[in-house]
Every structure is written in C-alpha cells, then in structure tokens.
A protein has these predicted regions:
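Immunoglobulin-superfamily
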Residues: 2-128
C-alpha cells in the first residue's frame, strides 16, 4: 500500500511541476527597442510575449511605474506617447510581463527614446 501511495504522490508531483513549468515558459516577442523620435510627435513602444496566457503587463520609466495620462498611456501591452517631451520621457523604459498565476515576472531590456529637437530634425529633412 505504501508503494502505491508513493507512486501516486510521485505522479501528482510530476504533473504539478510540469504544469507550473509550462505556464512560466514565455519570453518577449517583440521586446521594446530604442527609437529616434522628434520632440512633440507621437511614438508607440511595442511589447508582447510568446505566450499571453495569464500575463499582465506594465511599463516603468527609470524603475518607476508609468501612470496612464491623456499624453502617455498603456495600450494593451504597448506604451503610447502622443506628445513626446524631453523632460518627461527621457530615461530607461522597460516592459514588465507577469504571470498572474505564478507571480513570475520578466523585465525587458532597456529601451530609450532618442528625442530629436524639432529644429535639428527639420534641418535633417529640409537642408538649407
């Protein structure tokens, strides 16, 4: 009888370990990337994972959560900025993806906005 119980317990443990491992198998696809953007224009930073099942997303700027405003907000798993501002949007942006069942979170690589001045950007496109 104890052998049967040990086998049953072993099977249950394997099933639970296998289920947990499968839920936590996700990676960024696509991961956020640094971009050039003209100050005052809009930008979208993409973020998604290979397996969205039970995944919640949020963004950080220099390690602090990005709060939704009318100018900057999370759109699904992406971050949108309608009016890029050098003072408010410069820094290290990261997407955080968390499996809400297990609590395991992945932090993306750093993405930065290379914010170009309007004056400099226009001279690039319309040389004098």
């Amino acid at each position: 009888m104890s052998v049967t119980i040990a086998v049953m317990v072993g099977v249950v443990c394997v099933a639970v370990i296998g289920a947990t491992r499968q839920q936590d198998s996700f990676y960024f696809d696509p991961a956020p990337v640094s971009q050039d953007v003209v100050e005052g224009s809009g930008v979208r930073l993409r973020c998604d994972v290979s397996n969205r099942h039970q995944i919640a997303f949020y963004w950080t700027l220099d390690g602090k959560p990005v709060l939704n405003t009318s100018r900057r907000w999370q759109d699904g798993s992406d971050l949108r900025i309608s009016w890029v501002d050098r003072d408010q949007d410069s820094g290290s942006l990261r997407c955080i993806a968390t499996n809400v069942t297990t609590g395991i979170a992945l932090r993306s690589a750093e993405a930065k906005l290379n914010i170009l001045c309007k004056h400099h950007a226009s001279s690039l496109f319309f040389p004098i």
